[in-house]
From Swiss-Prot:
Xref: NCBIfam families: PRK04136.1 (NF003161)
GO annotation terms (biological process): translation
Organism (species): Methanocella arvoryzae (strain DSM 22066 / NBRC 105507 / MRE50)
Protein name in the entry: Large ribosomal subunit protein eL40
Record's keyword terms, sorted: Ribonucleoprotein, Ribosomal protein
Annotated family: Belongs to the eukaryotic ribosomal protein eL40 family.
Chain's gene name: rpl40e
């Protein structure tokens, strides 16, 4: 995980396009590169 909470929020609060794997804003509804609407939240590491 990131050292600072601000850095962690900036790198992990994203959506990933299922088609081209581009990073998109969290509030995006479609991909900025290919226009595909299948976005998923970026996976986060589980804390134990």
């Amino acid at each position: 995980m990131a050292r600072f909470p601000e850095a962690e929020a900036r790198t992990l609060n994203l959506q990933i396009c299922r088609k081209c794997n581009a990073r998109n804003a969290l509030r995006a509804t479609r991909c900025r590169k290919c226009g595909y609407e299948g976005l998923r939240p970026k996976k986060k590491e589980l804390k134990k």
